[in-house]
């Protein structure tokens, strides 16, 4: 089964279990709307890629970890779009969840996805219960405090912000979790994989800053120029377009260099390179700034 099929199957199973008889119909609809169709699914793909290079001896657990990470990412998008944060009308080319279902259901479905992520992980660990606690800690730390997504969102409420700390918490933390959880799900030492996630996560946020500044709504499927409008920390504001583009290239190179020697190293490096090319604004794809 392909990686994409594994991710889709795990997410479909999780959503189906959460929306069985008894679930309020509109909440069930909002959950499905939030998860499908997905974006690039880069975080779960990264999780499964690392699990694969580490032997993937527990594919059901790796799939559950990948699905949990994607559910947490989807939850963060729903909450990020809320009127109290970005007040974004679009996400992935369609109305954001609070626009489609109202603010109350958007809050509830975001919360429900956070819970569902850990339920999914627990269900997937029945054959390897000894691996569950490390996975819970890894993935929990990536979304909570002091260095997870919640902390990253909170940095937007502070008068002074370290750009690196903001990027690491808001975006990088879940990339770290994807890499570390992939190794943990396969019963491997996760330590060598942390650096891959740290560099790749920061690279992804720098790319997002560049796309927010340089792309249009049709290209991104969501509002643009939001960093400037909301006064949020941005690599473009701090470094300029040329500086941010160079920072992105440096971070991608560092992520590739961090991939440890293993049977699937070349494939993983190719995945990182391909993803970095995908997220670059078109005008920068060939190195122009």
What are these regions (language model features)?
Residues 1-289:
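All-alpha prenyltransferase/terpene-synthase fold signal
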């Amino acid at each position: 089964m392909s990686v994409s099929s594994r991710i889709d199957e795990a997410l479909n199973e999780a959503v189906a279990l959460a929306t069985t008889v008894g679930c309020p119909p509109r909440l069930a609809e909002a959950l499905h709307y939030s998860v499908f169709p997905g974006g690039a699914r880069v975080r779960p793909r990264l999780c499964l890629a690392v699990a694969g290079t580490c032997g993937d001896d527990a594919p059901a657990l790796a799939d559950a970890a990948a699905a949990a990470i994607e559910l947490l990412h989807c939850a963060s998008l729903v909450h990020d779009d809320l009127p109290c944060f970005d007040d974004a009308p679009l996400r992935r080319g369609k109305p954001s969840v609070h626009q489609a279902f109202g603010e109350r259901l958007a809050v509830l479905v975001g919360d429900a996805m956070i819970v569902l992520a850990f339920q999914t992980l627990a269900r997937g660990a029945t054959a390897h219960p000894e691996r569950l606690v490390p996975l819970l800690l890894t993935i929990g730390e990536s979304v909570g405090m002091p260095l997870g997504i919640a902390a990253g969102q909170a940095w937007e409420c502070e008068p002074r912000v370290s750009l690196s700390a903001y990027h690491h918490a808001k975006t990088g933390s879940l990339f770290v979790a994807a890499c570390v959880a992939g190794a943990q799900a396969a019963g491997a030492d996760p330590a060598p994989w942390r650096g891959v996630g740290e560099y790749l996560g920061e690279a992804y946020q720098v790319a997002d800053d560049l796309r927010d500044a340089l792309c249009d709504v049709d290209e991104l499927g969501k509002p643009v120029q939001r960093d400037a409008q909301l006064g949020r920390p941005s690599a473009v504001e701090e470094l300029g377009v040329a500086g941010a583009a160079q920072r992105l290239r440096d971070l991608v190179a560092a992520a590739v260099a961090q991939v440890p020697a293993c049977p699937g190293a070349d494939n993983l490096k190719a995945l990182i390179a391909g993803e970095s090319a995908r997220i670059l604004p078109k005008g920068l794809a060939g190195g122009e700034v």
